[in-house]
Amino acid sequence: MNRVKKVVAIFENLAVFLFCTVVILFLMQLFCFTSFRIPSDSMEPALKDGDRILVNKMIKGARLFDVFAALNNEDITIHRMPGWGNFKRNDILVFNFPYRMNRWDSIRLDVMQYYVKRCIALPGDTLEIREGFYKIRGCDERLGNYNAQQSLANLKYPEQYGIVVGTFPYDKQMDWTIREFGPLPIPQKGQTVKMNRTNCLLYRQLIGWEQ
C-alpha cells in the first residue's frame, strides 16, 4: 500500500510540475518572448527563408486581444502592456500588415498576418531615398541592406526586371519612386503637422486609424 501511495505521489508531483511548466511557458510567450519563422527571402542576407527569430515583447509591451475574434476576421480591441524600451534604427521588427482584403484606402490591421522588416526611421526623423539609397536627415548611419540599395541604384531600367518603381502615396504630382522618395517626416508624439495637400496624402490614413 505504501508503495502505491509513493507512486501516486510521484505522479501527482509530476503532474503539478508539468502543469506549472506549461503555465509559465504560456505566460512567457504571452508577455515576454515569442518566436517567428522567416517566410521569405526579403530580409537576406541577415535573415534567410526558414530562419527562426526570438522576439522580445517587453521592449514595447505585449499586446492582448481576442484571438478567436481575429480568426473570424472580426474587429478587435488591442490592449498593450507597458514596455521598458524604444526601437533603434536598423532593429529588426515584427509587425502586422496594416491592410485587409486588398483594401488600400484605410488602415485595418490583420493581427494574424506578420511581417518581419528592418526599422529605418524613428519618430522625429525625416526619411528620404536618393538614387536608391536610404537617408535620414542629420544622420550619417548606414541604413538597411546597403548592397541591395546599391544594386537598385545601378539598374538603369528596373521596370524591365518586373520591379514596380511607383510607391506611396501614389500621387502623380509628387511622383515618388523606390529610388527617389521623400522627404517623408515621421511624426513624433506632441508634434503638430500642418494639413496641406501633401501632408493630407501622407497622413490621412494614419489620422483615420488613430481616430
Where are these regions (language model features)?
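N-terminal signal-anchor transmembrane helix
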Residues: 36-46
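Soluble "head" domains of membrane/secretory-pathway proteins
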Residues: 2-10, 44-211
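Hydrophobic membrane-insertion alpha-helices, especially the h-region
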Residues: 13-31
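Cytochrome P450 fold signature focused on the C-terminal beta-domain
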Residues: 34-35, 121
